[in-house]
Amino acid sequence: MIISSASDYREAARRRVPPFMFHYADGGSYAEQTLARNVSDLENIALRQRVLKDMSELDTSIELFGEKLSMPTILAPVGACGMYARRGEVQAAQAADNKGVPFTLSTVSICPIEEVAPAIKRPMWFQLYVLKDRGFMKNALERAKAAGCSTLVFTVDMPTPGARYRDMHSGMSGPYKEIRRVLQGFTHPFWAYDVGIKGKPHTLGNVSTYMGRQIGLDDYIGWLTENFDPSISWKDLEWIREFWEGPMVIKGILDPEDAKDAVRFGADGIVVSNHGGRQLDGVLSSARALPPIADAVKGDIKIIADSGIRNGLDIVRMLALGADATMLGRAFVYALGAAGRQGVENMLDIFKKEMRVAMTLTSNRTIADIKPEALVDLSKL
């Protein structure tokens, strides 16, 4: 099929990847209201076109935590990303590296830190959950530091897993899930060969390395449910700082008071995020949560936004709403599932081109020029 946008990659991934993996990325929690709102709230914000300004010199690059990014985006941490393409985390990291943006490795990746880090030139970011096993957390931080990871992304909106009903229907969880996955593999032969056979081992690489035994996909949801720690508090940041001296970003902030706490406890950045609508359904979209958070802490801490970004125009919208940078999750997973590393590289090219068009026609030469005045909220008209 012809690929011209991220939505095309979604359709290509739907055809190529078996349902249990496609819907794991595509779905949200409960009735998926927040998942839908993340997208629709961005769509309801129009860009203010401005003309007759010299836009011959345009720059999409930024500097973030001492790193030069070719565009204001980071590939977000995605669990089990290695199930979308053969050794998928390596391919996605190489694509990001080639396009000049950071890749964030998930705690629950298929490929371990030690496999991904040597495959790229620029330092990757590493994402960490608060887990009951503090020994694992300490081990993961030490390994990330030894591998040269530059920034820690500390995810705080998963003290307990969200209820993702779609996963039960698709075969990721629910009754007879193993049999259903095998049958789906038969109807998706390319994926079955490329990932199912050539992409082994299908284990949680970082966890398996620490445990000294294989923690496979069948154990994935159960392991997470058993190990997420509902006692998570701001004091955990102090504990993490004992083992991590580099930049630390708190992911999962939706309230201005939490953003202020992140500043007070010494975080270097926050990610305004509702986990892509995969945790608590019914919460604010990131687009709606972002402006009051920016009003509260802009300039005191770096603000990154994710959830609902489907094209380069959405990146510009998030920047105008107050973000310093953005994270992409589903968009790159669709591209990875559809076409591997080349798909992710092409997706980033598409987003960058869309950004450049939007910046040109809103008369913003640099990322720093993008302000709230570039937007019109259609819901208020």
From Swiss-Prot:
GO terms for molecular function: FMN binding; L-lactate dehydrogenase activity. GO terms for cellular component: plasma membrane. Residues 1-380 form the FMN hydroxy acid dehydrogenase domain. Its main location: membrane. Keywords: Cell inner membrane, Cell membrane, Flavoprotein, FMN, Membrane, Oxidoreductase. It holds the Pfam family FMN_dh. One of its GO terms (biological process) is lactate metabolic process. It is found in: Cell inner membrane. It is an enzyme of class 1 (oxidoreductase). The active site is at H275. Its cofactor is FMN. Its EC number is 1.1.-.-. Substrate binds at Y24, Y129, R164, R278. Belongs to the FMN-dependent alpha-hydroxy acid dehydrogenase family. This is L-lactate dehydrogenase. It comes from Haemophilus influenzae (strain PittEE).
